[in-house]
C-alpha cells in the first residue's frame, strides 16, 4: 500500500498507477500494518456521503448501529453543537471533532476515539480535494490499543460512487504531526490488520445498501 509519506498519491489515484495495493491488508517491513479497501456504491452520491459522516455521530445511537448491526454499538461526537450548526459546511462538520465509538473489528467490542482532522492538518495537499479521484474525504487518527491513521475518499463512479479506504496502523498524533508511534522492533499482528480489513468490507458493503434510503428519509432530520 502507498506509504504514509506518499499519501497524496492516494488522493490523485496515482498510487494505483504506481502499483500500490488497492484492496488487501498486511504488515510492512518496519512492523506497521496497512489496510486498503474500495467499495462501489450504486445509487450513492458524493453529497450523501458528506452528510453521512457527521449525521451518524449525533442524535440516536441507532444511527451508528444501522451501519453495521452486528459490530457497531455507538458513535458520539464530542462537539455536537458544532456538528449541528447549520453555518458549518457539510464537508467541514468532522474537522476537529472526536467521535467516541464502541465497535468490534474482530477482537471483541472495543472503545475507540477517532480524532477527525482537516485534510491539511493530516498532511494532505487540499488543492487535490474536490477534483478527479477525490471528490471528498474524511481523515482521522484512531486512538485505541493500536494507534492508526485513516482516510476515506470518494468520487463519482458509474451509477454511484467509488469509496476508497486506507489505514496506516501504528501511526499516531504527536506534537501536532502524524508519525510512526509503533515502538522499534515491534510488529502489528497480522490478525489485527486482517480483522480491520474484513470489518471494513462488511460495514461499507452494508452502508452502500442502506444509505440512499436513509438519506432520502432523514436528510432534513439532522
Indicate residue ranges for each PLM-predicted region.
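A generic structural signal for well-ordered alpha-helical segments enriched in polar/charged residues
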Residues: 55, 101, 111, 206-209, ...
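Short, isolated positions within intrinsically disordered regulatory regions of eukaryotic proteins
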Residues: 55-59, 71, 99, 158, ...
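Anaerobic metallocofactor- and corrinoid-dependent redox/one-carbon enzyme cores
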Residues: 148
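Terminal "cap-and-tail" regions of soluble proteins that handle hydrophobic small molecules
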Residues: 1-30, 141-143, 153-222
Amino acid at each position: 500500500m502507498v506509504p504514509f509519506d506518499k499519501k497524496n498519491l492516494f488522493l490523485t489515484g496515482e498510487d494505483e498507477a504506481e502499483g500500490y495495493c488497492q484492496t488487501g491488508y498486511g504488515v510492512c517491513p518496519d512492523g506497521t500494518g496497512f489496510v486498503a479497501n474500495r467499495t462501489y456504491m450504486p445509487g450513492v452520491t458524493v453529497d450523501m456521503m458528506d452528510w453521512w459522516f457527521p449525521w451518524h455521530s449525533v442524535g440516536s445511537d441507532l444511527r451508528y448501529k444501522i451501519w453495521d448491526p452486528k459490530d457497531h454499538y455507538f458513535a458520539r461526537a464530542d462537539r455536537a453543537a458544532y456538528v449541528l450548526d447549520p453555518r458549518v459546511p457539510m464537508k467541514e462538520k468532522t474537522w476537529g471533532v472526536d467521535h467516541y465509538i464502541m465497535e468490534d473489528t474482530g477482537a471483541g467490542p472495543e472503545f475507540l476515539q477517532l480524532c477527525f482532522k482537516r485534510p491539511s492538518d493530516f498532511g494532505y495537499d487540499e488543492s487535490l480535494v474536490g477534483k478527479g479521484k477525490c471528490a471528498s474525504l474524511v481523515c482521522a487518527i484512531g486512538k485505541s490499543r493500536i494507534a492508526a491513521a485513516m482516510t476515506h475518499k470518494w468520487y463519482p463512479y458509474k451509477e454511484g460512487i467509488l469509496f476508497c479506504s486506507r489505514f496506516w496502523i501504528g501511526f499516531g498524533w504527536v506534537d501536532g504531526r502524524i508519525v510512526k508511534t509503533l515502538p522499534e522492533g515491534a510488529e502489528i499482528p497480522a490478525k489485527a490488520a486482517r480483522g480491520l480489513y474484513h470489518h471494513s468490507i462488511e460495514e461499507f458493503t452494508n452502508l452502500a445498501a442502506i444509505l440512499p434510503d436513509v438519506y432520502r428519509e432523514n436528510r432534513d432530520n439532522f
